[in-house]
Amino acid sequence: MESASLAAGDVVHFKRGSAFSGNIRISESGTAAKPIRLTSYGKGDLPKFTNPTTRDASGNALILGGDYLIVENLHFHDTPGERVSGMIIMTRLAALRIERGADHCIIRNNEFIKTGQGIMSAGEHTLITENYLDGPSYALWRTSKSSWGPMGIHLNIGNQEVSYNTIKNFGTKDSPWGSDGGAIEIDYGKYHKKNIYIHHNYSEGNAGFIESSWDYDWPPYRQEIHNWRVSFNVCYDGQSWLFMLAPCTGIYFDNNTIARYNGFGRAQNAGARIDVRGGKPIGKASGAHFRNNLFIYSSSPYTGNRSSGALKTANWYSKYKSPGIKYKGDGSQAGSGDPGLVDLEKQDYRLKADSPLRGKAVNLSEFYESDFDGHPLPKTGNWDIGAIQYNAAKPNKALQPKRRSPYL
């Protein structure tokens, strides 16, 4: 692969059942009409890729350095790792890394197992979709007062889309913070953080779903965040669902189902943490807007120094095992109490026919077309609250992938 010369429209086939160790870098570019594609062929387990040491290309098993590249149906595993420097974690560490300037790449239908960071992307107009990521529980680095990671998907820049992925078990349980890591992290202050769309993902057992950093970036530049949509995700994690540190402008969290009643061994178990540290005026959080979300919580649906300033519309709040408690922190809420789900304890978040969430959400059809299960959203009339709209029929197949390979 290192010596192969690729051209637009080429397809590189890796045999199923094969294994590769070390680094591969693709520097050539495809075009919009003729992308270069890396895929698998044959029968059996997906082709396996690893790089066991940061001394070789910072531990990257695959680096994309060109435009219009597609990576699909590959398996990445056991990339570094513990005791990695903060600079490498911020800028280079991942099983699969998209370099700055490598734009219009697609990462789809792959597996990432026990990777300290699964995917890192500094490329714009990237699509990361339908991947299965199952992470480790160790910190990438730690001191007596701090630690960092692991992370499933690490975005270094804006203009990216993360959709229909399954992300599980990225996070520590013994960090000085209580726990650290998470499903998706958006930082590296050198590049802008505009136009990010995160939707229809399933996360479970992570130390949080999304974090946007501020003072903790490397280099220590600060990037405010603009024009994000985080919608129709189902999140059953520990730690905070969100940890928003950067000042927000036009940031929307719509129709998510947030289940925070199992800490997964972690000390913190809050919902949305809005702890904005910068901006003018300092800490203003009115650019964050929560609409049509279902919060199932054991501690609090919101926390942080600016959470009360975030805008809230038509959300529902359910205190775990205390359905009679009305949440008092949202005067515009759709309601509080038992949400009427099919089976909360078995993580079946579909609505029963008599669920009070039905018809209580505002219609956002100008932005969205389908719910978490792929059912079309009504063009007119009120919606249901949460990621899954009521439907009498159980979906035939989940849109978010399950693990295909039994090994490792």
List where the protein language model places each region.
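Residues on the solvent-exposed faces and adjacent turns
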Residues: 16, 28, 40-42, 51, ...
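Parallel beta-helix/beta-solenoid
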Residues: 7, 15, 28, 33, ...
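Acidic Gly/Asp/Thr-rich repetitive segments characteristic of extracellular carbohydrate-active
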Residues: 1-21, 25, 355, 373, ...
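Predominantly extracellular beta-rich ligand-binding scaffolds that present long acidic/polar faces
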Residues: 22, 27, 57, 200-203, ...
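Right-handed parallel beta-helix/beta-spiral solenoid domain characteristic of secreted/periplasmic
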Residues: 13-14, 20, 29-90, 335-339
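C-terminal accessory segments
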Residues: 331-392, 396
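Extracellular beta-strand/beta-solenoid scaffold signature
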Residues: 25, 51-62, 84-99, 113-120, ...
